[in-house]
A protein has these predicted regions:
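Hydrophobic transmembrane alpha-helices that form the core helical bundles
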Residues: 61-95, 103
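Extracellular/periplasmic helix-exit of transmembrane alpha-helices
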Residues: 29-41, 187-191, 195, 213-242
Length: 253
């Protein structure tokens, strides 16, 4: 989802929406830091804290609805995007295979991996893939050598015509609501009344800021390479079939 959204943003609007990434990164750091402090200080995750502190039945029902929307619907939409993205990649590699088989096949294989309990294998494989992807996009950005002035101009807030949905998509793929519940839950599980809570919170804030900032830099690289490859060129509209154009400065035709 992030790759597709950032690529579309760069291809259609150049560097004009970089400010959205900056806003999203700062907002995500603040929100996840608050969720982390809640988990560390109280030993409760965000859902438990909502249940314990909201007494009015109407507000409690509303909170339950919002939590279900953030975790259930949000996760389903996120995974649907992942499956669709993986399917589009395989369609490009195997154009003669019926494209309708890929999404259910990937879903079945993913469920099998989770059911096997070998989560560490999946985690390590994903880490390797993310590192490789990050290196490719950042290296491509360096080789493409876009104008620094154009990049810096993108930090000035603006809304080009037709960009509002892309802005919302960039924010939505960065500020992920269910991550707030996950983050607070992970920290709540580590809660220890004997620990130096201030030290734990400080370390958590540092880790959160570094990881989210790194993610923002990678997203910036994706947006920028798409801008160089598509915006103002004859490459046409970006699609699953021609998205590799943005990587040509590094990988060639």
């Amino acid at each position: 989802g992030t790759i597709t959204t950032a690529s579309v943003a760069g291809a259609n609007f150049g560097f004009a929406l970089i400010w959205t990434l900056l806003f999203s990164v700062i907002a995500t750091i603040l929100l996840q830091s608050m969720a982390a402090r809640l988990g560390v200080a109280t030993g409760q995750d965000l859902a438990q804290a909502l249940r314990a502190n909201i007494q009015t039945p109407l507000f409690k029902s509303l909170a339950i609805f919002l939590v279900i929307s953030a975790i259930g619907v949000g996760s389903a939409a996120y995974e649907a995007g992942n499956l669709s993205g993986a399917s589009m990649g395989l369609i490009g590699i195997f154009p003669n295979v019926n494209p309708q088989i890929w999404t259910p096949l990937i879903a079945f294989l993913s469920a099998g991996l989770l059911y096997s309990g070998k989560h560490k294998v999946v985690e390590n494989a994903l880490i390797v893939l993310v590192i490789l992807m990050s290196l490719v996009f950042i290296s491509t950005l360096i080789m493409a050598s876009p104008s620094l002035g154009d990049i810096l101009s993108g930090f000035t807030p603006s809304l080009p015509e037709g960009s509002i949905t892309t802005v919302l998509a960039l924010v939505g793929t960065t500020i992920v609501p269910y991550n707030l519940f996950l983050h607070s839950g992970v920290l709540a599980a580590k809660h220890d009344s004997k620990s130096d809570l201030q030290k734990v919170i400080k370390q958590t804030n540092v880790d959160t800021s570094l990881s989210i900032t790194l993610g923002g830099v990678i997203t910036l690289a994706i947006l920028s390479t798409a801008s160089v490859g598509f915006y103002g060129t004859n490459a046409g509209q970006i699609s699953a079939a021609n998205r590799a154009v943005q990587l040509e400065p590094l990988l060639g035709d």
